[in-house]
Amino acid sequence: KFDSNGPRYTSYPTADRFVEAFNAEALRTWLAKRAVGGVSKPLSLYFHIPFCNTICYYCACNKIITKDHGRSAKYLKYLAKEIEMQAACLGGSRQVTQLHLGGGTPTFLSHDEMRELMAAVREHFTLVPNGEYSIEVDPRKVDFETVQLLAELGFNRMSVGVQDFAEDVQQAVNRVQSYDETKLVIDAARATGFKSVSMDLIYGLPKQNVISFNRTLEQVLAISPD
């Protein structure tokens, strides 16, 4: 069962659906089909923030490695236009029960940029009060004030990147992150009212072994993620 590769499913539509024949008109046709049977069905939205300060060697996501925050400002300008166009195509009721910010590193955005993005979302979509609003967080670039802002903007679920706490593994994959700074972010999330906090781990990384990964699991259990 687990001795062969499976599809890498991260979002819908999956990347292999975006072929040359899939043009703007095809997208509009897809979106128009939502009206069939009523437009009251709730939506799930995914926003991709591709920017990262440094590269993690294991990462296969669509990413842009840069320390130039001017690039994210330009990206948000076009993302706001895309939000407006998608909302117009969907028409009717645009109630959202799930929203997720992934990347890349969503917290690459400045506080003002994060406010700008969520204002654009709320201008064109209705986020229901009891929805699930999630964001991926890099503990190396987040402080209490950032977590507090995310809570104020309506986020209630946080996914914290860890992968492994073993220092030699972290060095091998170019992602050095201490247990303490990880715990600080998770404690901040709980203090500011996040309903759920998860932690991402990867097995099969360079330098890992059963003993070291078991130690990482024990540290994760000590934090007690949801």
Regions found by a protein language model. Name each.
Residues 47-63:
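Local cysteine-cluster metal-coordination motifs and their immediate loop/turn environment
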Residues 45-47, 160:
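Short beta-strand motif preference
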Residues 37-39, 48-51, 92, 191:
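Short glycine/proline-enriched loop/turn "hinge" motifs that connect secondary-structure elements
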Residues 1-43:
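Flexible, acidic/Gly-rich N-terminal and inter-domain linker regions that tether
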Residues 43-44, 98:
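Structural motif
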Residues 14-17, 55, 64-65:
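A short secondary-structure junction motif
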Residues 44, 57, 133:
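Divalent metal-dependent hydrolysis catalytic cores, especially in the metallo-beta-lactamase
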Residues 63-92, 96-226:
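Conserved non-cysteine loop/helix-boundary elements of the Radical SAM core domain that shape
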